[in-house]
Amino acid sequence: VRPEQRVNVAGVQTPSLYLGDEALNNNFDDVDEFKQMSGGVATVFVRSGEDFIRISTSLTKQDGNRAIGTVLDRQGPAYQRLLAGQSYIGRAVLFERSYMTQYSPVRDASGKVIAVLFIGFDYTDAQNAQFANLKRFRIGQTGSLALLDEQKHWLVPPAGVQALEQAVPVILELAQKPGQG
């Protein structure tokens, strides 16, 4: 990292990050090759203060443009682990898409985290297809499966329920019909 040597990445001034003599800011060769070879996405983040900024990525935003110049979400599952110098492997929602991810910290000679390497595989479409199948699944005439995520949003709502607060009356009604729910 060369913090004194700033590079403009999508309108954001970032510290320059090098691999040997090669600047990684705005260099998309390796991340695009990873995408072509694996079908996944890759990102190089550089640390700037307490933020990690995407300086090279094959990840795209909703508008189809590269997500360069954007920062790692401080509220996301990886952020605190990376600050502590630990990797994160798990789910992340990025630009409204679900990914299975790995974030790995990069340290300088003193052990300070100066950058992050990321790879991710988008499973949004496969997950949506599976949820659609589960929504159609019935147990008996009126029974159904239900899946609630950690933010209490329905991934697969019970039959007849769209909002969490609707679930209790529907479940109570079904419970009053033994053998029919």
Regions found by a protein language model. Name each.
Residues 2-84, 92-94, 151-174:
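Extracellular/periplasmic ligand-sensing ectodomains of membrane signal-transduction proteins
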Residues 40, 97, 115, 141-143:
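Envelope-exposed proteins and targeting segments
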Residues 43, 90, 144-146:
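Conserved beta-strand cores of small sensory beta-sandwich domains that regulate signal transduction
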Residues 45, 119-120, 148:
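Generic beta-strand/beta-sheet core signal
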Residues 86-93, 101, 179-181:
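PAS and PAS-like sensory modules
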Residues 107, 148-149:
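Hydrophobic alpha-helical segments, especially N-terminal targeting/anchoring helices
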Residues 132-141:
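Sensory modules in modular signal-transduction proteins
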